[in-house]
Amino acid sequence: SDVAANTEMSQKVLIGFACNPNVYGVVIIGLGCETVPHKALREKIQAMTDKPVVSFGIQEEGGTLKTIEKAVRAARDMAAEAALMQKEECDISELLLGIECGGSDATSGMASNPAVGELSDLLVGMGASTIMSESIEWIGGEHLVAKRAATPEIHNQIIKVCEDYEKHLKAAGQDCRAGQPTPGNKAGGLSTLDEKSLGCIRKGGTRPI
């Protein structure tokens, strides 16, 4: 069981994965009594895409092994169908690049992140779009990200994302700076969340947001 807001977010994330254009088909397995029912999830995905989607409930199918057998068979059928697809050219304006952290150390903000930011700028300049994830890792550098906002409204939204996340953690008695940087980040030479954030935001390049 879960609170409604978390359940809704879980569904949105799963639907987002399923609708990703890099995914040919979807096989969903559920227990049968969870707060995100596999049938409802399947129907929502089908309403948003025409890709093949099937779902199985362990309790309905008669156990785990029977469910796995059917799911594997369905996945193999989809893989065979996907192998027959032909590549098609598309306009670069249809390209959306997701930018994700790869484990930060003292060199990330000087080398790898700026390189990714340069790629982002090149693609955006050609008409593509990029998304920089992990807004928690903007904290301490969000004012620099906000400076790139194309409008005052977007500027305020960027600041609000970070403020809301900190408020959410504080309401639960947590401090985002207590767990950031991670032990691995510190072993790599980072000392504070602000330092990590200044490197993180370099991934986003310099183009207007």
Q: Which positions does each model-derived feature cover?
A:
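Metallocofactor- and cofactor-centric catalytic cores in central/energy metabolism, strongly enriched
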Residues: S1-I209
